[in-house]
Amino acid sequence: MKALVENLKATARETDATDIRAAFAADPNRFSRFSTALDDLLFDYSKCAVNDRIIDGLEALAKAAKVEEKRDAMFRGDIINITEERAVLHTALRNRSNRPVLVDGKNVVPDVNAVLEAMGRFADHVRSGDLKGATGKKITDVVNIGIGGSDLGPVMATLALAPFHDGPRLHFVSNVDGAHIADTLKLLDAETSLFIVASKTFTTIETMTNAATARAFIAGKLGEAAVGHHFAAVSTALDKVGAFGINAARVFGFWDWVGGRYSIWSAIGLPLMIAIGKENFGRFLDGGHSMDEHFRAAPLRQNIPVLLGLIGFYNRNVLGYPSRAILPYDQRLTRFPAYLQQLDMESNGKGVTLESQPVEFSTGPVVWGEPGTNGQHAFYQLIHQGTDIIPAEFMIAAKGHEKDLRHQHQLLIANCLAQSEALMKGRTLAEAKAQLTSKGMDEAKADKIAPHRVFTGNRPSLTIVYDQLDPFALGRLIALYEHRVFVEGALFNINSFDQWGVELGKELATGLLPVVEGRESAEGHDSSTTGLVAALLKAAR
């Protein structure tokens, strides 16, 4: 692998691969040669710093890393999460073909379908008004209490699919900061509110702290006997859920082969199903399944998740770019960059190989972004003229949902395409000076100002286009990026499905709580932590 990467570096230098502007000038068919499609989903990577020899080298890299074999092992249900000794089968949750999927010799598809049907019945009862609160009033507000994968996925998808909401209002509480739950409770009528507590173990400290506050809210307003009428849970810890006061009929489980950041397809997606209905949730699953089938069957050079992963690895380890910007030109995808941030950085932010050795490559990049056009008036300055090159990933729908605002969607499209073109083409010093003098500026001043208006160009980007953001399109888009993360993890030779980096801080926080509460001494902690605790305790008096 190391030799193949070094060969790619040499090829990039020899072929001037990073001169994207020259590549377009030399090849009028570059777009058609470096783009591919799955139905209405178009993937354009022609503005990336690639050429035929680079793609050849990346394909060889994929074969050397056994990407296809590792992919097949995942779909087969092999134990690929080696540190936790688990299969990785979020794909089984959206297996619309009902093709058997075996875990320890058992076909899990019937169990998946049974949970999906139970979710559908419950969602229907909430949406229709048949499920009522303790005082007989129908539910108007649903609050999901979770964190990490139990929050980001439902939040992101619920916002993204707002045009399909025909159920009760949705709210999401994640942060242990009491302000989050307090601000949410102010919006609610206890009699018409339903809380969904999403925690597989029912022990997640942030989630259970917020759940206890919500429980006290219901009990305080309606009495202790009302609690069971206003709560449901997504968990496998039936004993703890029962002790909390939630009836087993309102508990929806999922499996240890579903990681939190991949769990939107599971019962964690219950709030989304309540918002958009089980038929639309089914279309969401259909979209994910369609990308799964493409990922499984398409040749490497037409395989969109594989190409996306190879380009990501190439940008990181051949060209040395440390981050990537996720730029959806869709306001309803406002949380999609944050969702991908968790998906990518929690999966591939690792430093140890599958053989328990230090990795030989730079692993996951920093993933960040905001919707366009907002970002254009914030951080695009750095992307265009900063000293670091940041590959950009644009996404845009051909059609918006607001038919009477078609002119605004056209303006949105124009901005999206203009940004990718500007990143590639840039503006030379001569062009900048000519523009200034054409507006009447004298030569001396133009010579001074023009360097500030130079854009180097040759800044890589890719663009994903789809017809319209609907449940199918969103499911397909999420699955595309899930598989991209898988491909990059296979190239890094790491386990993309554990998250031990989350644990140390949690352990230390548990030990620090009695210190912060003033019940124990800070002795034994470093001087910075000791000093900070003292300052905070003094200020809080």
Curated annotation (Swiss-Prot):
GO terms for cellular component: cytosol. The keyword Isomerase applies. One of its GO terms (biological process) is gluconeogenesis. Pathway: Carbohydrate biosynthesis; gluconeogenesis; Carbohydrate degradation; glycolysis; D-glyceraldehyde 3-phosphate and glycerone phosphate from D-glucose: step 2/4. Its main location: cytoplasm. Pfam families: PGI. InterPro entries: G6P_Isomerase, G6P_Isomerase_C, Phosphoglucose_isomerase_CS, SIS_dom_sf, SIS_PGI_1, SIS_PGI_2. Keywords: Cytoplasm, Gluconeogenesis, Glycolysis, Isomerase. One of its GO terms (molecular function) is carbohydrate derivative binding. Its EC number is 5.3.1.9. It comes from the Bacteria. Disulfide bonds: none annotated. Coiled coil: none annotated. It catalyses: alpha-D-glucose 6-phosphate = beta-D-fructose 6-phosphate. It is found in: Cytoplasm. The active site is at E346 (proton donor), H377, K506. Catalyzes the reversible isomerization of glucose-6-phosphate to fructose-6-phosphate. Belongs to the GPI family. HAMAP family: G6P_isomerase. This is Glucose-6-phosphate isomerase. It comes from Sinorhizobium medicae (strain WSM419).
